[in-house]
Amino acid sequence: ESYDLVIANHVLFYCDNLEKVCKEVRRVLKPGGRFLCSTYGNSHMKEISQLVSRFDERIVLSANKLYEKFGRENGAQVLEPWFSRVEWISYEDSLLVSDPEPLISYILSCHGNQNRYLLDHYKEFRSFVKKKTEKGLHITKDAGIFICNY
């Protein structure tokens, strides 16, 4: 089977072998088909990491910097050998967080070591985040999509 369009939304940085992924996408795309793959860059939501580091510098929200595997900064290099045209389109966006609870829930759900340091100090951390979000905490979104033509 072949397809006009293949979409990979924020998943390529989880793949062990990006060359194999690109080869398979090329195999299933019809001539003239497109591969759309979204990702983010190294500034994506950086304020959240800065926030937790200010509370406890030992906290790392993710042991892996996924954008280093496939992100805005290096995605074109990964894709260009496989596609005739690769274009990056930024998704202009940001967050203004004024309610600490969803932010705390997000932080606790990350794949890093935060629970080791935050769960025993949850009340302190909640107060810290509440104070930081009182006037709204701006969070940078550094995401977008690569459009690849076959």
Q: Where do the protein language model's features map onto the residues?
A:
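A short acidic, Gly/Pro-enriched loop at the edge of an enzyme's catalytic core
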Residues: E1-V6
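A short beta-strand submotif of the Rossmann-like class I SAM-dependent methyltransferase core
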Residues: A8-V11
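A short glycine-rich, Lys/Arg-flanked "PGG" loop and its adjoining helix->strand segment in the class I
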Residues: E19-R34
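Short, glycine/charged-enriched secondary-structure capping and boundary segments
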Residues: K20-K23, Q50-S53, E101-I104
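Conserved class I S-adenosyl-L-methionine
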Residues: R34-R58
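Short, polar/flexible loop-turn hinges at active-site or ligand-entry regions and domain interfaces
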Residues: E57-A63, Q114-N115
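Conserved Class I S-adenosyl-L-methionine
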Residues: L66-Y150
